[in-house]
UniProtKB/Swiss-Prot annotation:
Pathway: Carbohydrate metabolism; D-ribose degradation; D-ribose 5-phosphate from beta-D-ribopyranose: step 1/2
InterPro entries: D-ribose_pyranase (IPR023064), RbsD-like_sf (IPR023750), RbsD_FucU (IPR007721)
Subcellular compartments: Cytoplasm
Entry protein name: D-ribose pyranase
Matches recorded under Pfam families: RbsD_FucU
Organism this protein belongs to: Thermoanaerobacter pseudethanolicus (strain ATCC 33223 / 39E)
Gene giving rise to this polypeptide: rbsD
Physiological role: Catalyzes the interconversion of beta-pyran and beta-furan forms of D-ribose.
GO BP annotations, alphabetical order: D-ribose catabolic process
UniProt keyword annotations, A-Z: Carbohydrate metabolism, Cytoplasm, Isomerase
Length: 130
C-alpha cells in the first residue's frame, strides 16, 4: 500500500505522468468538463470531498509552477481566494472564468470534487522539482 497521502490511483497516475507545464484542473461540482479531457469524478455528495481537501492532497505529490483561478472568485468566494493567495503567492494568476474554461480544454485531466461553492476551480501548471 502507498505510504503517501494521495491514495486515489487515477489521480496518482495522472500526477506521475505530468510533465513540465502540463495542466491539471481541480474543479467544483459544476465546472463543465470538455469532451476529450480525462474526467476523474470523485464527487460523492454536496461538499464531499471538498475543493481544499482535494487540492491539499494533490499538492503533496505535485510541484506547481503556476496556478490559475477565475477573477470572479475574488468577489464570489473570497475566503477561498485569500486561502489560495496565501498558499501560492506570486504563482497565483488571475484570469476570467471564460478563459479558465477555455484553458481547461488543454488539461491532462479534470478532477471533479463535491465542492458546492462558486468558482472553486483551479488550473495547476506542473513545475519541475530541480
Amino acid at each position: 500500500m502507498k505510504k503517501t497521502y494521495l491514495l486515489n490511483s487515477e489521480i496518482s497516475e495522472v500526477v506521475a505522468r505530468l510533465g513540465h507545464t502540463d495542466l491539471l484542473v481541480i474543479a467544483d461540482s459544476g465546472l463543465p468538463i470538455p469532451d476529450g479531457v480525462k474526467r476523474i469524478d470523485i464527487a460523492l455528495t454536496k461538499g464531499i470531498p471538498s475543493f481544499k481537501d482535494t487540492l491539499n492532497t494533490v499538492l503533496t505529490e505535485l510541484g506547481v509552477e503556476k496556478a490559475y483561478i477565475a477573477k470572479e472568485m475574488i468577489d464570489k468566494n473570497n475566503d477561498l481566494y485569500l486561502y489560495l493567495l496565501e498558499l501560492f503567492g506570486e504563482k497565483l494568476i488571475i484570469i476570467s472564468h471564460e478563459d479558465l474554461k477555455a484553458m481547461s480544454k488543454n488539461a491532462r485531466a479534470i478532477i471533479r470534487t463535491g465542492e458546492y461553492k462558486p468558482y472553486a476551480n483551479i488550473i495547476l501548471e506542473s513545475g519541475v522539482e530541480f
